[in-house]
């Protein structure tokens, strides 16, 4: 027996169908991190990711100032609604107020830190003049390591989300 369902999952068509079916039990559904939208009866507990992405975009714009420059967007999983909303908010903020910033690409790490670091390193080799990295995902340490290996690290801005112990350490070290 149970009184409710608490779920933390990516937005996936099979999960949405299962949640719709679960609604017939009249038990509450609490969705952590992912808002499954109006088609699924649930309570969403989590941040407003679109606004968080907009804030990140405004910060990137302010840090890069009028000079602007090239920026890379790092995603973990495109199926994660929150991450998608963050990226949409980030892009909207850049588009509406920072025309000197050019988003040169969006890479997806699959929530794999090592892959995130490699993708950033690869982008830096193709765009040595890259000025900013926006990470909508969880792989901050490996991205910071990739940035630490290039010249002019101080010219690059790295923005991410969350204040985990790992990110607190990176923030104190000046990597974020």
Q: What are these regions, as identified by a protein language model?
A:
Residues 15-51, 164-172:
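Flexible loop/hinge segments that line or gate small-molecule binding clefts
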Residues 56-97:
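An alpha-beta-alpha
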Residues 2, 41, 129-130, 176:
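Local beta-strand N-terminus motif with an aromatic residue
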Residues 3-23, 90, 105-166:
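Hydrophobic alpha-helical
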Residues 82, 87, 94-96, 101, ...:
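Extracellular/periplasmic periplasmic-binding protein-like sensory domains
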Residues 45-69, 116-117, 163-167:
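Hydrophobic alpha-helical segments within soluble ligand-binding/sensing domains
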Residues 66-71, 97-105, 126, 130-131:
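Short, structured loop/turn "capping" segments at alpha-beta junctions
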């Amino acid at each position: 027996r149970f009184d409710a369902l608490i779920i933390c999952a990516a937005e996936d068509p099979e999960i949405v169908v299962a949640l719709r079916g679960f609604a017939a039990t009249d038990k509450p559904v609490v969705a952590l991190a992912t808002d499954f939208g109006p088609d699924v009866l649930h309570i969403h507990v989590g941040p407003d990711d679109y606004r968080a992405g907009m804030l990140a975009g405004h910060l990137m714009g302010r840090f890069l100032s009028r000079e602007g420059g090239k920026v890379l967007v790092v995603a973990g999983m495109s199926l994660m609604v929150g991450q998608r909303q963050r990226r949409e908010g980030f892009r909207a903020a850049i588009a509406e107020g920072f025309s000197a910033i050019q988003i040169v690409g969006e890479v997806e790490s699959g929530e794999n830190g090592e892959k995130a670091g490699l993708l950033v390193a690869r982008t830096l080799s193709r765009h040595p003049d890259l000025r900013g990295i926006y990470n909508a995902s969880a792989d901050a340490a490996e991205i910071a390591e990739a940035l630490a290996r290039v010249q002019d690290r101080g010219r690059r801005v790295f923005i991410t989300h969350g204040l985990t112990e790992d990110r607190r350490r990176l923030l104190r070290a000046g990597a974020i």
